[in-house]
């Protein structure tokens, strides 16, 4: 299928949101995944921005629309529009800052209040390159993820570790869910943004066999 106003072809369009406290590296995760760029001078995001990237999974072309917003409290008024239409969320904390990890439960509550109840959530421990400054153990975060039924991964936007894998995994998980019969026979899903309304194509093909991912 071809997106309107673009020659780029894709089978599915999924909106993914990045959430978490300010300074955990959300903007650099976005730029590393979509443009393979990293900036040490990144300032706190003001308002909202999004970027897109197309990937292949199980023979399908998936276009990810990844949204980024500041985690600071004064910007929380935008949350309802920010979450609207999102089918996945990367909840990011800084492994070298315990306070950002302690905020994770609050972000989960905000997700539950504003996002679709079936949104796929991945907990992301970012800045894994700062292992010498680690304040949050991998085992603790894994245990938390299992308790809250989240997937979990540690990444580094600085050295690219697991950034590609994190997005690939959550997009594949969403594809498995969205290609089930209960999703493929219903009305088309739309993604609302401030700039355009995007139709999420449905599929008449049978769901792909589920494959494992971390």
Swiss-Prot record:
Subcellular location: Contractile vacuole membrane
GO molecular function: GTP binding; GTPase activating protein binding; GTPase activity; nucleotide binding
Gene Ontology cellular component annotations, sorted alphabetically: contractile vacuolar membrane; contractile vacuole; Golgi apparatus; lipid droplet; membrane raft; pathogen-containing vacuole; phagocytic vesicle; recycling endosome
Membrane topology reported for the UniProt record: Lipid-anchor
CDD domains attached to this UniProt entry: Rab11_like
Disulphide bridges: none
Motif Effector region, residue range(s) on this chain: 42-50
Record has Transcription regulation as a keyword: no
Major location category of this protein: membrane
UniProt cross-references to InterPro entries, sorted A to Z: P-loop_NTPase (IPR027417), Rab_GTPases_membrane_traffic (IPR050209), Small_GTP-bd (IPR005225), Small_GTPase (IPR001806)
Keywords: GTP-binding, Lipoprotein, Membrane, Nucleotide-binding, Prenylation, Protein transport, Transport, Vacuole
Function: Required for normal contractile vacuole structure and function. Cells expressing a dominant negative rab11A exhibit a more extensive contractile vacuole network and enlarged contractile vacuole bladders. These cells exhibit a functional defect in osmotic regulation where cells immersed in water become rounded and detach from the surface, and contain swollen contractile vacuoles.
PANTHER family associated with the record: DRAB11-RELATED
UniProt family annotation: Belongs to the small GTPase superfamily. Rab family.
Annotated protein name in UniProt: Ras-related protein Rab-11A
Organism: Dictyostelium discoideum (Social amoeba)
Gene from which the chain derives: rab11A
């Amino acid at each position: 299928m071809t997106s309107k106003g673009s020659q780029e072809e894709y089978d599915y369009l999924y909106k993914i949101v990045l959430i978490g406290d300010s300074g955990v590296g959300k903007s650099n995760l976005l730029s590393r995944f979509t443009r393979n760029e990293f900036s040490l001078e990144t300032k706190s995001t003001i308002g909202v921005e999004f970027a897109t990237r197309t990937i292949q999974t199980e023979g399908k072309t998936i276009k990810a629309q990844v949204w980024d917003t500041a985690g600071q409290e004064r910007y929380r008024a935008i949350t309802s529009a920010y979450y609207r239409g999102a089918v996945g969320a990367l909840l990011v904390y800084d492994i070298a800052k315990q306070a950002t990890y302690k905020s994770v439960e609050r972000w989960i509550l905000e997700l539950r209040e504003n996002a679709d109840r079936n949104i796929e959530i991945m907990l992301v421990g970012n800045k894994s390159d700062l292992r010498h400054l680690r304040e949050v153990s991998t085992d603790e975060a894994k245990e938390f993820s299992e308790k809250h039924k989240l997937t979990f991964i540690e990444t580094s936007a600085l050295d690219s570790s697991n950034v590609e894998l994190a997005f690939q995994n959550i997009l594949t998980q969403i594809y498995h869910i969205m290609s089930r019969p209960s999703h493929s026979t219903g009305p088309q899903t739309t993604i609302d943004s401030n700039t355009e309304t995007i139709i999420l194509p449905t599929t008449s093909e049978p769901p792909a066999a589920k494959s494992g991912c971390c």
